[in-house]
Amino acid sequence: LIDRLDYAVMIRKRIYLTAAIFLLVVSFSAYYLYRVNRSARSRLEYANGLIEVNPRKALADVEQINRTFLSERNYMMCDLVKAGALIGMQEYLVPDSLLNIVSPYFKYKADSLHLTEIYYYRGEIARHSNFLLEAVEYFTLCTQYNNDVYDLRELNFYLNNFKGQVYHTKHMMKEEKEAKLAALSLGKELNNPS
């Protein structure tokens, strides 16, 4: 009977020891993940501040962040800051695909601050690609989500400028169509021998 009690106590001690070690490992892992994400968040905030001044440095800082154990938010912020830095360096192909990845996450989280950035960046991409209708659409969305992130005077200038260009393009297309129809009717008259 005593041997059975000693054996039960020994098993119970092993279970407690295993549970304590498990809790210790889990707490160290959680603390490590917290520190990694906190460090990444501060580096991302620093890099985000550098986008306007030195986009190459911002891009280099984002590239140095190890993304293995990042939270979903920090991972998406890495892509957003990277897209902003690339747009600052006037490279427009890669940021568009990065923004396609990031946009649904911030829409789901209803994060108007970052949605403003996304629409501003998309407007910049469309503006430099001469897609004026898309630029107007994205800058309009940017003004709707804007929480004093961007100067509304600049956005309104872009909007009015692009709306004017779109109107001018549509008006020119109408004149071109009329000129084409006039040329076709003149050609038909010249071909008609009567």
Regions flagged by a language model, labelled:
Residues 1-21, 28-194:
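A "functional boundary" signal
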